[in-house]
Amino acid sequence: MKKLILILVVLFVSFENVSAKDYILEQQGKRILVKEHIYSKTDNLKVFRLEGTFKDNAGNFGETNSIVNVITINNVVVKLEASNELIYNENIRAYNTAKRANNELKQGVGKWHFTYASKSINAIISSDCLYSIRYYNDNFLTLAKCDIPEQAFEQIKSIIK
């Protein structure tokens, strides 16, 4: 019984020290076709650039850009992967990879995973987000909700505005 109580206390103390914060990002901008391979009327590979701006719930406003690879078969997205760059004030940067969870062409949902970041905001590395994206002609709007450590949110909040 003492061992069980000790294990529960250790687990409780461990989880108490791990706190997470919701980090909300909104991006908008233009989608630019870089290259496409048209295999048939319904099958293709397209490489896009997304360029625009973002704002977050920590009061930041910055630039964003992405490189997106899309494979479509029978007019259905079978694979979509992207690398996204966020550029904050003072050239502070964070990078995440995106994977789409659905197969619609004009809108989508998926996950981001932060892979790299400037030293001043490096606590965001390994954080995950759920995102949704919607296209209108060559414009896009993305909303993301990220579960990041409290330390990462404080680092992001401390970026000079």
Residue ranges and their predicted role:
Residues 20-161:
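Beta-strand-enriched cores of mature, soluble protein domains
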Residues 4-14:
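Sec-dependent N-terminal signal peptides
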